[in-house]
Amino acid sequence: MTDFWSGYIIVLALANIVVVAWLLMWTRKMDLSEMAEDGTTGHEYDGIKEYNNPLPRWWLICFWGSIAFALGYLALYPGLGKFQGALGWTSHGELQKDEAAYDKQYGPLYASFAAKPIPELAKDERAMKVAGRIFANNCAVCHGSNARGGSGYPNLTDNDWLYGGEPEKLVETLTNGRNGVMPAWLDSMGEQGVREVVAYALSLSGRKVDADLAEAGKARFGVCAGCHGANGKGNQALGAPNLTDTTWLYGGTQKKVLETVFYGRKNRMPNFAKTLGPERVHLMAAYVYSLSHK
């Protein structure tokens, strides 16, 4: 924050408090010379007259108390531009304090989990209970509370993996995240070309399709083979899905597959290296591993 904006915020905040205090003093009682003979202010509407009674004392005390609280808060805590407050408190510092206390209490537990190989850890009932809570807080929002995923979010309970389901691959995915891209083919292939390729792609998994369309699509499939392979079985190094099974990330209906090839797809799996740290990443990899090895 620049000095100008810091000063601007300080002046604006304090000026607001001063104006409110002045307004309270100015309106607390009307000048007696302006009062009508009947003790009213002279204001009347629809038969209702306004009397010049003093503000309730409890209300005044609360109002002045709120002003005092505001000034005290701004003196002790951040709120006036660059001024950090007399206590030097920051939310970042509070977070670090809480994290340090958490690591002190649970660090040895996670260290004991990290010492075990993932296949062995996946069978540790206590470890999986802890991991289940971490999953609920960090992963369930996308993959679902039952880990079965949804449209665009992989099912973690089966044995179909875009980037590989080996322990080291799961750690890699959780640590670095993934960025999946499927290019759009409508402009380069045209609508008819896309329909032909989709017919062929669906035939690879045993679906009933128009034979002529599928045959024409087979000739065009060469541009897809660069990622999905000549046999359509995919490539885990690229995250290219297997087209010969019945697992479809965005839906396997003809309409959904056409939509995918027409317009492409972009998907992102966030990384958890900083959020969880290596020990909890190891634990979560074991949890995900356990879901498909029951």
Model-derived features: positions:
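Acidic side chains
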Residues: 46, 52, 155-158, 167, ...
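Sequence/structural segment immediately N-terminal to covalent heme-attachment motifs in c-type
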Residues: 123-148, 158, 164, 171-176, ...
